[in-house]
Structures are given as C-alpha cells and as structure tokens.
C-alpha cells in the first residue's frame, strides 16, 4: 500500500496534504536517489498557474539544493514540456508541480526520470521509503549545496518541438481555431504555436490569476469553448486542461470530440501511412466499445489497461506500441513524447484535417459511440466497495447487462471518489444499472 503516491504522482489539498514540509522532503529524497555518477547533478522544475505553486516550488528548491542538486526553474509550462526539457537539458530528474484538471485549491508533484518518463512504481516506493527516513546526516556540506537558476526562452523551445511534429508541407493556414488554455500551464505556448503554424487563433482561458485554473474553462468544462466556436463560426475548438497533458476537441458544429474519437482518427491515418509499430493501439477499460469495434473493422486491435496514462504508456513501452491514450484526452504518441501531450495530439488531428480538406465533424465521425454513462460517488472514509450491499448491487448489474454491455467500477487514484461506468446498446438499461450501483454506494458511504 503506497502512502504518498497515487496514479499520477503526489496530489492533494495545497497546504493540507501538499505542505512545504512534504515538498522539502520530496526534493531531498528524489535528489538523493537520482544522484548517479560524479557529474554535477541537476533537476528541472516546472509548474502550472496555481497560487500554491510558488510555495511548493520554493520548498522543492530548498530540498534539492540541500542535497547538492542544481535546480533549473522553468516557470509555468505544460507537463509534456517539462518531460521533454528534462531529456533535452540532460537533467537527472524532472518535476512538474500541478494537480492537472483539479481546482486551484489542490496541487501535486509529478516526477520524471532522466529519460522523460514518469517514474516506475518501484522507484516511487523507494522515494516513499526515504520520505519516512531521517535524512539529516545525508545532507550536503556548506560547500556542496546546489544552486537555483531560472531558465529563459523555455517557451520557444517547446513551441519549436511542437511545430516539428507536423510535416513541413502542412500549415494551418485558412483555419480559424479557438483554443482554451484553462488558465493553466499552456496559456502562452498553445496560442503561439497555433499562430506560428498559420492559423487564425482566438484564445480563451489565457488570463491566469492563481485561482481560476480550470474554473469554467478547459477540457473538463468545455461549454465556454463550444459557445465561442459557434459564435465565431470557427473550424475547430481545442481545450487543454490545467497542465496541458490532455485535450478535448470541439468540431465546427460545436460537437465534442473525446479521446476515443481522436485516437480513432490518428490510428486510421497512421495505418494508412504505415506508421503504426503494432497492429493496434492501447487504451483503458474506460474507452468506448464503439472504438474497439471500429478498430476491428480496420484490422486493428485494442488493448485495454487499468485507468491512468502511466499504465497505458507502460504497456506501450513493454510491447512496442506507438499510439495509445484515454477517453479523457490523454493521448500518447511515443514517436514524439514520453507522456500525454494535449497540444501535440491536437496538431496531429489538424494534420489529418488539412490533408483531407474536410470539416472536423466529418474527419472525426469515425464511429457511433455506444451509450455510456459515468457517475462519481464521493466518500469520506472506509471501503464502500467491500460492503455486502454494494457487492450484491454490482453483481446484479453485471448480470442484467450480460453480453450486451460492460460495467466498470473503479476508485480514483487521486481523490476519494468511486467511478461507476456502464455502456451498452440499450441506453435505458445502462442508465438503470448505473443508478442502482450508485445508490448502493451512496448508502454504504453515508
């Protein structure tokens, strides 16, 4: 049982769970663990736009420098940019301070190895062991402390990286693009990248104030984007989340395009271009059965993993896949990046749109998703899923669905929430079984 790390780093209420003391210890523990060889060790630190980012950044700097590591500060940058710059700047470790799509009150710490990949469970376990240890005797002497330096021009480096994922022959000229940056980490780089590629860009969610990240904007709140796309008759809307590792697209009609549909478009395009390294893609248990059926028609398979982009990526790396992701919009293209990258995923879709010279609605309507219902049940303590009444409700729901659908029950890895998802050909039945399980969970959690 892990004490600090969830499925996406350490996350919780800022100054409640994520305290300066914890951040200091994380810097010391990770700094000690990743000091290998005799060279001068360095860590790259980026963050999103939450007010608490200043506090956590400062504490991390103290932790890393106290064990002799030099710190390179990037300021507000997308998570995939931090991963990329960790590799590019030959750092021993990378850190992203973010709670992704969560509200500003939360924050988190994500760690990357020198290769830009998220840490394995084993490495995180070793860091947890050090977090609970007395490290005082392992701190550096006065002459061996690290230094901190703020790095300039990092935005331009990431913009150039993102642009290079498009073929040289492709421009975005003639496209009117609305991009919603969630008042988060991509508020500068996303609009600039799209503009440099030739698009007419209308940007929203680009005025962070420390409190408004993800508030009524971004990939988890796309209504503002939908309205703006319709109002301006834009060709496409692109919504990123707070740290820009996930994306949701809106077509010219204001219809939402989720991660499943994005993966379908890219999988078809890459199959035609013979770019897929395996005859299929990797997704999670939450991806729609319609995606699986569509890929089957193309002669491609769908491998499902546990929920979490880290598990998708682990399977991709172990089995040689170069395309995978989540319905929520984490799209991983290992030809380009070591983590989900919302901007790069959107650019790959725009590549297909420009090549085919068709509206986004036509390009993205690959399959009809099966009716799918997802509800969240919040609980305070205990294990509601172990209650007899809940077990009985789940068994009954699965029997009612039979072979005509799927039921997925899973606890969130980042918050005290249980997610209940069902899908099938009969929407009324799907709604009924989800409501039955949700009611049982609510009673058990009361």
Swiss-Prot record:
One cellular component term from this protein's GO annotations in UniProt: cytosol
Presence of the UniProt keyword Magnesium in the record: yes
Record's comment on post-translational modification: Activated by phosphorylation.
Class of enzymatic activity (EC top level): isomerase
UniProt cross-references to InterPro entries, sorted A to Z: A-D-PHexomutase_a/b/a-I, A-D-PHexomutase_a/b/a-I/II/III, A-D-PHexomutase_a/b/a-II, A-D-PHexomutase_a/b/a-III, A-D-PHexomutase_C, A-D-PHexomutase_C_sf, A-D-PHexomutase_CS, Alpha-D-phosphohexomutase_SF
GO MF annotation list: magnesium ion binding; phosphoglucosamine mutase activity; phosphomannomutase activity
A single GO BP: peptidoglycan biosynthetic process
Keywords linked to the UniProt accession: Isomerase, Magnesium, Metal-binding, Phosphoprotein
Catalytic activity: alpha-D-glucosamine 1-phosphate = D-glucosamine 6-phosphate
EC number: 5.4.2.10
Cofactor comment: Binds 1 Mg(2+) ion per subunit.
Residues holding Mg(2+): 100, 241, 243, 245
Catalytic residues identified in the record: 100 (phosphoserine intermediate)
Residues recorded as bearing Phosphoserine in the entry: 100
Cofactor(s), names only, from the UniProt record: Mg(2+)
Main function: Catalyzes the conversion of glucosamine-6-phosphate to glucosamine-1-phosphate.
Membership in a protein family: Belongs to the phosphohexose mutase family.
NCBIfam families named in the record: glmM (TIGR01455), PRK10887.1 (NF008139)
Name of the protein: Phosphoglucosamine mutase
Taxon lineage: Bacteria, Pseudomonadati, Pseudomonadota, Alphaproteobacteria, Hyphomicrobiales
Chain's gene name: glmM
